Amino acid sequence: MSGKGKSAGADKASTSRSAKAGLTFPVGRIHRLLRKGNYAQRVGSGAPVYLTSVLEYLTAEILELAGNAARDNKKSRIIPRHLQLAIRNDEELNKLLGDVTIAQGGVLPNIHQNLLPKKSGKGDKASQEL
């Protein structure tokens, strides 16, 4: 006897926790990292699923915005500059990742208002002539 009960012949392939939750990121790996990281003595079964879904959502959001930035610059490959532009131009992501430095990200283009050339109106020429 194999000890599998009545359905000894019908072996079903195991389904991963990522597939059960409908996620792409690995739930098992996140669970292992939570256990090995000494964050708590015990880790519940729902915590890694929730954390994995949050990580997957944030990654998808950042990559979508970075892809839009790459397309705006007529590029087909996302580089750190596109990630920087995507994060800094989004209010919520900028608040979340405000203290993060992205290597090779550059800075946002910003010219102070006082340094811009003044717009000359029609009455300016008469006032400057003496």
Curated annotation (Swiss-Prot):
The modification Phosphoserine is found at S127. GO terms for biological process: DNA repair. The nucleosome is a histone octamer containing two molecules each of H2A, H2B, H3 and H4 assembled in one H3-H4 heterotetramer and two H2A-H2B heterodimers. The octamer wraps approximately 147 bp of DNA. The keyword Membrane does not apply. There is a cross-link at K125 (Glycyl lysine isopeptide (Lys-Gly) (interchain with G-Cter in SUMO)). The [ST]-Q motif constitutes a recognition sequence for kinases from the PI3/PI4-kinase family. One of its GO terms (cellular component) is nucleosome. The lineage of its organism: Eukaryota, Fungi, Dikarya, Ascomycota, Saccharomycotina. The modification N6-acetyllysine is found at K4, K6. Phosphorylated to form H2AS128ph (gamma-H2A) in response to DNA double-strand breaks (DSBs) generated by exogenous genotoxic agents and by stalled replication forks. Phosphorylation is dependent on the DNA damage checkpoint kinases MEC1/ATR and TEL1/ATM, spreads on either side of a detected DSB site and may mark the surrounding chromatin for recruitment of proteins required for DNA damage signaling and repair. Gamma-H2A is removed from the DNA prior to the strand invasion-primer extension step of the repair process and subsequently dephosphorylated. The keyword Ubl conjugation applies. It holds the Pfam family Histone_H2A_C. The record marks K118 as: Not ubiquitinated. In contrast to vertebrates and insects, its C-terminus is not monoubiquitinated. The modification N5-methylglutamine is found at Q104. This is Histone H2A.2. One of its GO terms (molecular function) is DNA binding. It comes from Meyerozyma guilliermondii (strain ATCC 6260 / CBS 566 / DSM 6381 / JCM 1539 / NBRC 10279 / NRRL Y-324) (Yeast).
